Amino acid sequence: MKEAERKRKILYHQHLTSRCDAQTAARDVLALQAQFLRHAQMSLRLRTRDDSWKQWVKQSVKTRAFRGTLHLLDAEDRLLITSALWKDYEHRKYYMARYYTPQEEQLFCNAILDLLQQGICGRRKIYTRLVAMGLDEKLCELACSSWDGLFAVLNIQGKVMFQHAASREFAYAPISLRSDLDACRKELVYRYLKGYGPVTLRDASYFFGWKKKELEAVLQKIHNVQMSDCNGSTVYELPEEIDAYPRIPTAVFLSGFDPLML
């Protein structure tokens, strides 16, 4: 496969040369990285043919997803994405784990969930309540830090989510995670190939935050994955019946953290 052909396919699958409605675009790229809301909005606007992106953003779910970072994703995909990814953090493989023992973490998380269920959502208010419970003040501060602290852990576990796309406060919103981890990962990688292919193992490894061997094992379970050589690298894609892909634009001005760059 020539590099130009690969680029045409990727731009088409990313809806940068095949604009569509907002929900289709958002689901095909799986999620929009949202450290800055305006970047996620611009990424979606580039891929939509109308103003449907505005309503989609209002109805989207803001949560931590791929690589543990903030994303906007379609409400229909929250269960699949969270179920496929939360296991990556099950063994306390995140930065907050260095500050808390497992027992302390559980104590703080339970206290935060109780307060959220009472409708106390502001970080400062939750911090004040935790301190009033007699908990260690430094750990209370870390739990409610501007980097989301233990809220990030609860977010990744599917127990809380942000109140809306522009919010920095969380809401109690638990979901019953699927137990079929392998099936979830297979479905997610299949959709990744559909929206990002042709991809290299290195591309996929960065996107998911998984080791290449893990991804190879998942790819082997997906029916009809096609492999080609492109500039000395193996690329993976799904078969499709398209005679010709749109030409590569002279320039495409992307937002920060655009899915194409990730």
Language-model segments: which ranges?
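Internal, well-folded beta-alpha domain core
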Residues: 113-142, 191-232
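Non-catalytic regulatory appendages
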Residues: 214, 225-262
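Phosphate-backbone binding and catalysis cores of DNA-processing enzymes
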Residues: 1-136
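Short, amphipathic alpha-helical interaction segments positioned at domain boundaries
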Residues: 81-98, 175-197, 245-262
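Loop-centered beta-sheet repeat module
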Residues: 140-216
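Intrinsically disordered, low-complexity boundary segments flanking structured domains
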Residues: 30-31, 56-60, 149, 223, ...
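Short, cationic-aromatic polyanion-contact patches
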Residues: 74-78, 166-183, 234-244
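A short, conserved structural fragment
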Residues: 57-70, 155-165, 223-230
